[in-house]
């Protein structure tokens, strides 16, 4: 009985099974053409002008609070995350890519308000705040690169012999 069943199974596999493992290949037809975009395809968003990008940057950071976390980097290792908060009172363009950010900076037991001169460069439509060796009263000298995107921020910073990473969300103060 087992040999009969094995023979029938082998015959079925040989007869039908080979088609299971074969791949159907579609022969190219002369009528095959690239598909045209459908009406459902959304048109690309128009790019904002430099003036519109500056206005958006200013609106994002005026009367804004950046709340998030930072961690130190020591010997290539990330430290524990700690909370921080930056309150931006106002942002003004000085000229070219130089801006003045009036900020209240709170971290640890420190709470200071200071005008911070920064450069603002762009990665496409995304502003990147650049701070190079800027003295913060009562705190030291810092350098940083902070990207602003869709009401979030992320960046890296150094201060003397230490540095770290930072990230969080941006919220507008209600009037």
Where are these regions (language model features)?
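Amphipathic/hydrophobic helical signal segments and adjacent flexible N-terminal regions
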Residues: 2-6, 21-61, 65, 69-78, ...
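Residues at the start of alpha-helices and the adjacent loop-to-helix junctions
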Residues: 2-3, 14, 147
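Bacterial N-terminal signal peptides
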Residues: 9-19
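Central antiparallel beta-sheet cores of small beta-barrel/beta-sandwich binding domains
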Residues: 51-54, 60, 64-175
